[in-house]
Amino acid sequence: MSARLPFVLRRLARPQHPGSPRRLPSLCRASSGRGSGCGGGEGLLGQQRLRDTQAGSSRGPGSPAPPARDSIVREVIQNSKEVLSLLQEKTPTFKPVLAIIQAGDDNLMQEVNQNLAEEAGLNITHICLPAESGEDEIIDEILKINEDSRVHGLALQIAETSFSNKILNALKPEKDVDGLTDVNLGKLVRGDAHECFISPVARAVIELLEKSGVSLDGKKILVIGAHGSLEATLQCLFQRKGSMTMSSQWKTPQLQGKLQEADIVVLGSPKPEEIPLSWIQPGTTVFNCSHDFLSGKAACISSGVHGISPIAEDVSLLAAALRIQNMVSSGRRWLREQQHRRWRLHCLKLQPLSPVPSDIEISRAQTPKAVEILAKEIGLLADEIEIYGKSKAKVRLSLLERLKDQADGKYVLVAGITPTPLGEGKSTVTIGLVQALTAHLNVNSFACLRQPSQGPTFGVKGGAAGGGYAQVIPMEEFNLHLTGDIHAITAANNLLAAAIDARILHENTQTDKALYNRLVPSVNGVREFSKIQLARLKRLGINKTDPSALTEEEMRKFARLDIDPSTITWQRVVDTNDRFLRKITIGQANTEKGCSRQAQFDIAVASEIMAVLALTDSLSDMKERLGRMVVASDRNGQPVTADDLGVTGALTVLMKDAIKPNLMQTLEGTPVFVHAGPFANIAHGNSSVLADKIALKLVGEGGFVVTEAGFGADIGMEKFFNIKCRASGLVPSVVVLVATVRALKMHGGGPSVTAGVPLRKEYTEENLQLVADGCCNLEKQIQIAQLFGVPVVVALNVFKTDTRAEIDLVCELAKRAGAFNAVPCYHWSIGGKGSVDLAWAVREAASKESRFQFLYDVQLPIVEKIRTIAQSVYGAKDIELSPEAQSKIDRYTEQGFGNLPICMAKTHLSLSHQPDKKGVPKGFILPISDVRASIGAGFIYPLVGTMSTMPGLPTRPCFYDIDLDTETEQVKGLF
């Protein structure tokens, strides 16, 4: 053992010269604590607290000199450094962080910790609290560190009297690098030393004895004045070395006799003055592990005592080094947890009934797992979720940074053939597939679904959580408010709408000077532009920041947006089907001074803000997209944006929580993200990019993320590939194309299918000819998917009226049409077990190389992109532009928006623009009646015919069946 180490400790214990610099204050920052803080004394030390200080401070007075090569401390630190270097070869940015919570003035070991950490390659965060900090204050700090995923270890440097059980067990065991918690101690006693952290102080005692050549077998060990985890750890470690261990307190009557018999003495607390050193026999090895000695406040007990081994003085420094070693082990465990692994998921058991009950009865019969348990099972940390009730949680975007080096899973899109008005079960197939993958094949999988609008829920469609034994639970929470994302969109959208009309009013009723003075007021004698106003000045080419420096022309240019009311495209929204809001007149009150105009309401999910939410990939990206949204043109034909109105920051504030995906679960306890639900006709109709990206990281390599596209493949899938995949950069592995015998019969010439009207006998009896004729639509949709180079698996969603012959016929014809595979699915009636064949088919298809490609180059002219979609996807002969559509195309091209992708808005009930044309219409001319732009979302949307953005209520809406049991508060009637 290097002789320098005891010298270092004695040097640290020596009072600092008054004239020498005190370096610790420079490492601290202000604390709200009372009295003296770290280091005691007066001034800055008494009022400050240090956070996030890297272990890189230069050595100064009191710093330990580098130990000799043969030093055990050097060996420990060098070993830690080498292990960390190996970890960093795979994860170069990884650097473990040790947090030290200090209450009081025990500073003398701080520089030792700093320099050892620096040498090993760690960072240290030092948190200084006032000396008089109570139990609750210390625990508050512990809990913060527990949930901070950037910190990998936590040590306490507090008064010995403060080490209460409550404080010790507030520590997260996996961050307890001092081995203080009951969990770590219990694992040690049980023999699981490799799974726990062991007290560095106790380990230091054992290491020093063994390195000095002392055999512990048969030795008598006396531990005096120790208690708690240190006493238990010392006893456990010594006993495993074959030693006879005794514990005693200082006031024990037989203490002198025990001391004289002991070969090794370990002091756990300061020696009382009345106990003479002569009681300790010459040649006895004494270790002082008392709190005061380890913190450098007291000298070693062996000072001046002949025959007591000097190695006892080295406990403190070696303990600090072993803490660093524990830190590296903690970091290694943390990295291992970040790596892809199969989830240890507790799946929920199903007991399917026949006949199958209603969706809400099935949902209510299954008790979901607590969402925090689900989150932990799939690898989410406690600080990465925000819990809403018992079964919902938002997931923070910080997860993407933590898992940025993890490989993505496979990306699967569920699309469909041209549907009947009843829908063909894409959501049900999506949920059935992930239940099969995870609950039955033990494969990590995630479903990513759109959030349904309350309008259709209370109108004609009912719930959208899947159906039968393949649904999201609790389905009433899924279908109603969820976590309020749509309400946030409504608030943000209508704030922007109000800002537009208010700005027109104020510009119409004020002079240039008055308008400018109100936009840039003097506050407490100071006049300055806001951040967003400075951005507008820059866009206008006005390079001035002093409001008083603008010329009259510049003030006018800045203050007046000069919006042309006839060009306003931004409408108010509400999440209710209300046909009487399709055309309204606003501004009729006398207070609006004649600024009335015709306007309309849209359904909330038709708002461009919903499309922005679905396509954004970060908070900053969302803010930029919101600012770019074009709401109108000025009288010179230039676009007016949310940024011009100065409302971008406020919109972002309203949307800051909505951007976080919502975590729920399926009936079998597998994870689901429910996030964003843009209108599938005027927008792209897919769930959010962020939900997909987070899910792909969570499932890891070998896992699957399954998402769905709205309507048929000709609409939803085409938009998914050309719009969503461009925005996300993600490449799909497989398309699952959902078909039903019912829909195929309709395309084969069967009678019309109408919601709310019983099906004709053609749909409930076997009819192979209708099925065969209708497979032309299935073949066309397979061909559309193949345009993008993605393999197709056909999922035949089986109904109870389908016959074996019909099922076999569809699967055979699908394979002939080029599908990779085609399988019948029974998830609706028996859950994930009924989609196991589909899961195997998807896994096999995903193992093949995807040759994904976009349908068109966005740099093509707008007209050519529209024509490409019409001819290649819909099968049209050509397109026909109305004069208004041509005018809009010319305007958008002139404004610089011609390079955006296309989002076609047309009926979903036919490949053509005519809903009654089933099968595969050919030779038609696709009429483009209008062209609009969602610049913030990032696409141009041509309107094919007329397209309503506000649904209406039918004669008998779904709300007739919806009720609440006022005794149990259970929702009834949500299908």
Swiss-Prot record:
Disulfide bridge partners, by residue number: none
Single GO molecular function: formate-tetrahydrofolate ligase activity
Keyword Acetylation included in the entry's annotation: yes
Gene3D superfamilies the UniProt entry points to: 1.10.8.770, Formyltetrahydrofolate synthetase, domain 3, Leucine Dehydrogenase, chain A, domain 1, NAD(P)-binding Rossmann-like Domain, P-loop containing nucleotide triphosphate hydrolases
Pfam families: FTHFS, THF_DHG_CYH, THF_DHG_CYH_C
Highest taxon above the source species: Eukaryota
Gly residues bias: start-end ranges: 34-44
GO CC annotation: cytosol; mitochondrion
Region span, Disordered: 13-45
Residues modified to N6-succinyllysine: K187, K593
Residues covered by region (Formyltetrahydrofolate synthetase): 346-975
Protein family according to the UniProt entry: In the N-terminal section; belongs to the tetrahydrofolate dehydrogenase/cyclohydrolase family. In the C-terminal section; belongs to the formate--tetrahydrofolate ligase family.
Record protein name field: Monofunctional C1-tetrahydrofolate synthase, mitochondrial
Gene: MTHFD1L
